[in-house]
Amino acid sequence: MELGFVHILSLIATLTVVLGCGIYSSRKVKSADDFDVGGRSAGVIMVAGSIAATIIGGAATIGTAQGGFTFGFAAWWFTLGSGIGFLIMAAFYARPLRKSGLTTISEYLVINFGPQAGPIASIAASLGIFFSIVSSSLSSVHLIGGILHLGYLPSAAVVVLLVMGFVFFGGINSSGMAGLFKVGLIFATIFVGGYLAFTDMGGLSGMHEVFPELPWFSMFGIGADHALFNLFSMIVGVVSTQSYVQSLFSAKNSRVAALGCLFAACIAIPVGLPSVIIGMFIKLHHPELNSIDTLPFFLCNYLPEWLGGAGLAALVLSCVGSIAGLSLGVGTLFSRDIFGAVLKVHDSKKLLWINKLMVLTVTLAALVFIHSHLDSSVLQWNYLSMALRGAGVFLPMTAVIFFKGMVGKKAGLLSMFGGIASGCAWHFIFPTSPYTLFVSLFFNLLFLVPSIAYNLLHSKK
């Protein structure tokens, strides 16, 4: 990509404003609780902004455009599925989770299944979240490398510095404030770009003239089994993700938590559609382009320079903000559930620094991992991530919420372990299979259903 002076000026100005928000937020951070959940004082907009900052990352923008370039409308499953997941979370999960007054999903499971549940849930959730960080890191390195004409190592170093500016100083407050600004930029640039691409191709009728119905216009163009896996992975993964639940814990009350989820869904669902259309536009006019460069190339070459520069900044913020929010979730899990619960570190300042160092460590680990996967699909890592997150958490947590007191501790632990072990084993044996998540859910139910049925029968006697 060749940037003009106005591109660069607009990009730098936008990044400066958002990083300034992150540094300003750090003034409010005095303890680990402030860093993790913002002192539990966030309003609806801050909760929604914090969730949006994490979900609208490399997959929702660059990855969805890459999918649109490759197979069309089926790439919309990522943001559509995540939005449906947030609606379900708002309806059934937000209130009981916020009322618990806890900080992590693992703590919620420990109360019901005993202390052994904490490390199992934390490690499983962190493994799943890690692959989402991989996805956004992949997008970030390609994007920053293209903007600054840098190789892998310098681009990775820039990513680390930006993540530190986002979260290292401000925690959940930084993620929320930056999220609000970023969402505004995404809507102002991606939607304008999508509209211009749509009209340039002659609307739907014009698109149908140059693209066949299958696979380009079908949500099941990649196969019904893969589409259903993608949808259920997103729903299960969203509900099971520490980073999103952490935003609920930061809300001032349960009503605010539910409304924040609802607003986040309204933001997430439409974002993927213009990215898909831009992907198809670039496929039509530049079929030789590397698919992962689709969206940055469009913003640089098909929008006015001032808007294109802001759009590129929005993509950088989108990718890096997602890394920041997800890394914060992993850092919180490890600091609270491993160092706090297992290693008995209870000093608030020590936990704060452990959390910050974990954010940095996880970011570096993801950047090392992508070095050997630089040409892979962004969305594939996210769908795998969501499936792994839900494997040991979704149904056990759901059972506790809907069948309170009806799940035995041993059954809960076996369900968690069985789901995680079977999911990992299945993916290792059949790496391209779309059934990983369903295998995990089957093993969850294998232990949960008998326990719930037994306790329900005995409670009626």
Where are these predicted regions, by residue range?
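Membrane-embedded helix-loop-helix hairpins and adjacent transmembrane boundary segments
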Residues: 1-461
